[in-house]
Regions:
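Short, charged, surface-exposed interaction patches
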Residues: 1-163
Length: 163
């Protein structure tokens, strides 16, 4: 029994059917309490914006939260730099995900812009079920590999056996 090995490549295209908005809020304040309360206020504003356009406040999910001390380098009178405490940085990373709808996306972005929370914003257009796309890609690659194997077998005067 002779064996040949072939590699298949696959191609799949999928139209985006899902939108993920990533929102980052960072507050820097001299005190921990002030940083936390200002961040909480900005989160409440974002939740209110989400509710105004038809979502529940729970739909705005926190993906990460951290508090760090910040320092800055300051030049003293002798020209030497030294680190000075700048405050506490409270950072929230949130996401809001929903089925693809460009009109709804425009409403959400407008509500966020109008709420005064001033988050950093990024928009990802993706597919809701990436496993289905991966499955289609594997099928395409397998069909490509089988076609290559059939061509090699025909050219060499052999029959394709079990796969």
């Amino acid at each position: 029994m002779r064996t040949i090995t072939v590699k298949g490549t696959g191609n799949v295209s999928a139209r985006p059917d899902y939108i993920i908005l990533s929102l980052n809020i960072e507050v820097l304040s001299e005190t921990y309490d002030r940083a936390m309360s200002e961040a909480a206020e900005r989160i409440e504003r974002l939740q209110g914006a989400a509710v105004r356009v038809g979502y529940r406040k729970e739909d705005l999910k926190t993906t990460s939260f951290d508090v760090q001390t910040r320092y800055e380098n300051v030049k003293d009178r002798q020209g030497n730099y030294k680190r000075e405490f700048a405050g506490y940085a409270c950072t929230y990373r949130l996401k809001l995900a929903f089925d693809f709808d460009s009109k709804q996306l425009a409403k959400v972005i407008s509500a966020i812009a109008d709420c005064g929370a001033q988050p950093e914003l990024s928009i990802a257009f993706t597919v809701k079920n990436p496993a289905r796309v991966s499955e289609e890609l594997l099928i395409s690659a397998t069909e490509n590999a089988k076609t290559k194997a059939e061509i090699l077998c025909k050219a060499s005067g052999n029959a394709l056996g079990q796969l």
